[in-house]
Amino acid sequence: MTDTSAIFIIVPTADVTSITSELNYVPASLNSEGFIHACEYHQVAEVVSRFFDNHLALSVLVVDVGLINSPLRYEAPSTTMSSPALFPHIYGALNTDAIVDVCDLVHFKHQPITPEIMAVLRHYRFERLPVESTLFKSTWRSSSNNTHGEPVGTAMIGLYCDSLTSVSCFHKLTFDEVWHFYGGDPLELTLLYQNGDSEQVVLGTDFTNGQVCQYLIPAGVWQGGCLVEGGQYALFGCTMAPGFTGSCFTAGIADALIEAYPNEEKVIQKLSVNGHQTTMPEGFAT
């Protein structure tokens, strides 16, 4: 056993909504074998290659060990694996409130999730933002609308962490956005301006080294963000007035951005988690 803060369950992405909408997860293996198969971070890749169709879209359920109601045992697998390490087995239904994140397998880093990050996930109960997959939680959405039908203001809390690939892809908004730094390690925003210039802004608490705790990003500026290298996580917030709606968001495509901003190719490639998606799903944040 190499990590005790989190275990992971691999499921088809198409099943995630039905799994998380129930109080308990009861897969077929619980009836046929008496337990739910899970794995540690370093076992995920082999489990996927051995037991799942490589054409199937898969997601990884991040399960907080401390929240599991059923007995958890570490046992030898029923089939021979490349490593002699024991596998976590859950002997009973999994209460779904122990699932603190759902990560697309293609973005899973196969790294341990520290107890500090698990504590933040447990407390805030983030969701994944469509297109970007950023861990976020909406904290305020005004009940008053402007003349265009948009909320007069919105606020959210977000979490950047590399071990769960929570970043912001390059995107632009039709309204100004104010960023706030709340805690953890510093984060870096890269801004790409229409005139071809770019800028890096570090949000954090070390103002003597140029970090800022608040920053305004003007409407129409390409913005992307991530944890500063070497950190565990960054907790931040964003507020907008008018408020955020799905229709005010446009994500960038890496090739086009690199052509326009060749000096920022490295960070553009790093943050292009959206692939070819450029718009939020219809009806999101309306």
Spans of features found by a protein language model:
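Eukaryotic N-terminal targeting leaders
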Residues: 1-2, 286
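Residues in well-ordered beta-strands of folded domains
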Residues: 11, 39, 62, 91, ...
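Active-site scaffold segments
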Residues: 59-60, 88-92, 214-216, 226, ...
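Short edge-strand/loop segments of extracellular domains
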Residues: 65, 239-244
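Short, conserved acidic/polar surface loops in the N-terminal third of protein domains
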Residues: 70-77, 101-103, 190-192, 227-228, ...
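Non-catalytic, conserved peripheral segments adjacent to functional cores
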Residues: 113-215, 224-225, 230-232, 242-245, ...
